[in-house]
């Protein structure tokens, strides 16, 4: 891209979570929330780390990107590096759901899913330094989800 364009920006958000439209595919937070709410067991991997991004943080970052117009690759991710099992425990805690339903497994439990490296986190230095957006911790993002749920109830 840099060979054909004089100026470019690639915006790379990582795995996002937050309330989504009912007609769309669930994200990790909504999927875990729904399963635990129904009292169903959830198997979550503990051997792949990512830094999940609250969807409102993504919007905030995109807005800053449009205003400041940096060039190059901008990663957009959350503050905390967690695996899906740890993320599930956060969901259970914040929403007051039964964490004992969450089962720790490794990626080999899901052979149909593409192999991933153990660390899939994205670096957020440019997000912080050039856009002025601070990555949101998982607990804070989930509490914002819970507050939004109460606001619409």
Please state what every model-predicted region is.
Residues 10, 52, 81, 104, ...:
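Short aromatic/basic micro-patch
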Residues 138-153:
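Amphipathic terminal alpha-helices
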Residues 56-64, 139, 143:
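Amphipathic alpha-helical segments that line or abut small-molecule/effector binding pockets
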Residues 20-22, 48-56, 76-94, 144:
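Substrate-binding strand-loop-helix patch
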Residues 1-50, 57:
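NAD(P)-dependent short-chain dehydrogenase/reductase
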């Amino acid at each position: 891209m840099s060979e054909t364009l004089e100026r470019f920006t690639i915006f790379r958000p990582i795995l996002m979570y937050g309330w989504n439209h009912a007609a769309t595919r669930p994200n990790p937070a909504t999927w875990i929330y729904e399963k635990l709410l129904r009292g169903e067991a959830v198997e979550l991997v503990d051997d792949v780390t990512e830094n999940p991004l609250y969807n409102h943080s993504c919007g905030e970052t995109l807005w800053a990107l449009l205003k400041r117009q940096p060039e190059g690759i901008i990663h957009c991710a959350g503050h905390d590096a967690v695996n899906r099992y740890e993320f599930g425990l956060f969901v259970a805690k914040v929403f007051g759901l039964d964490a004992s339903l969450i089962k720790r497994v490794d990626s080999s439990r899901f052979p149909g899913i593409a192999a991933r490296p153990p660390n899939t986190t994205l670096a957020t230095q440019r997000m912080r330094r050039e856009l002025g957006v601070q990555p949101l911790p998982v607990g804070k993002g989930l509490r914002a989800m819970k507050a939004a749920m109460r606001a619409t109830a």
